[in-house]
Design a protein with these regions (language model features):
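Terminal helix-turn-helix DNA-binding modules in bacterial transcription factors
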Residues: 56-93, 119-131
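Sequence-specific DNA-binding recognition helix
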Residues: 81-117
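…primarily DNA-binding HTH/wHTH and HhH modules…
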Residues: 3, 7, 103-131
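Central "turn" residue of the DNA-binding helix-turn-helix
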Residues: 41-44, 94-96
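HTH DNA-binding helix-turn interface
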Residues: 51-65, 105-113
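Basic, amphipathic alpha-helical hairpins
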Residues: 20-34, 54, 58, 75-84, ...
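Short, Lys/Arg-enriched, Trp-marked, Pro/Gly-tolerant hinge/linker segments that flank
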Residues: 1-18, 29, 56, 60-61
């Protein structure tokens, strides 16, 4: 996604949960350089409010929440695009660098992207970390 593709900010009065659900559905979390400040602007609230909301409602800090969204998307992509390398999948979800992607993927799932692909490519359900 390039900078010109950034969606217009949502109306300030819109419910933050609805705004975040729409942002997640649009896969806004895959954009490189995503920050708490940029997301707050997109959903029409201030940085502090968004941070408190994510911490209290989702039980994660902002960086861990974005990481979880990106890894969940990478799990889907690994299975849907068997010809894509792990590096390509990492870049598709906004995680740049092979070692960074492998480290984050392994931390969240407990296995490497290749192990995940081998284990679940046969149509088994998504890994337990996503249930």
């Amino acid at each position: 996604m390039i900078a010109d593709d950034v969606p217009e900010p949502l109306a300030a009065g819109e419910n933050i949960r609805t705004a975040l659900d729409e942002w997640i559905a649009a896969k806004g979390y895959v954009r490189p350089g995503l920050s708490l400040e940029s997301l707050a602007r997109e959903v029409g609230c201030n940085r502090s409010y968004l941070s408190r909301y994510v911490n209290s409602e989702l039980g994660l800090n902002f960086k861990l929440w974005i990481r979880a969204l990106r890894i969940a998307e990478s799990q889907r992509l690994l299975l849907e695009h068997p010809g894509a390398s792990a590096l390509e999948v990492g870049e598709m979800v906004g995680i740049h660098g092979r070692s960074t992607f492998f480290a984050q993927f392994s931390e969240v799932t407990g296995m490497s992207p290749g192990e995940y692909r081998r284990r679940y490519a046969g149509g088994d359900p998504i890994a337990p970390s996503q249930e």
